């Protein structure tokens, strides 16, 4: 564990350079749910709370929208959650909807509503795959020659949550 590593080789809680590297290596070794009680100390605050801390101390929440494809019902849920918690919304460059302004104590309630609607974390905070971007492909585009949406969704579903030393995005 990270605590055992510190006991043997260091002190403190880990710097911004060593902690993510050690977290990536150890997470790869046991490939388990990273928020288990014994594994949680490895996680940065953003990973632990599934929110990205902003300069004003609030958090942004970024649900996964594989390939940028989302149903009308899920859009309604995002809008209702944003309205109920007074969150600012923005379409990201990664084809997702980012919800800004959540207080730390609101995150469990926000995620409960999102998970109930079928969302999961978009890992916009962790060191893992964030998003696979796609055009609409041959499903809608007259110039499309392949099912790029289907491929993007399959790639994102296959690699979501896989830990790495840095975050990455498939284009």
Residue ranges and their predicted role:
Residues 1-12, 16:
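Compact, charge-rich alpha-helical regulatory domains located at protein termini
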Residues 13-33:
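Terminal amphipathic helices with adjacent charged low-complexity linkers/tails
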Residues 35-50, 125:
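Long, charged amphipathic helices and adjacent flexible linkers at domain junctions
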Residues 46-68:
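Short glycine-/aliphatic-rich beta-strand segments at the starts of folded cytosolic domains
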Residues 68-85:
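Short amphipathic alpha-helix segments
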Residues 82-87, 114-122:
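A common structural junction motif
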Residues 102-107:
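Helix N-cap motif at beta-to-alpha junctions
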Residues 169-170:
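Conserved small/polar residues in nucleotide/adenosyl-binding loops
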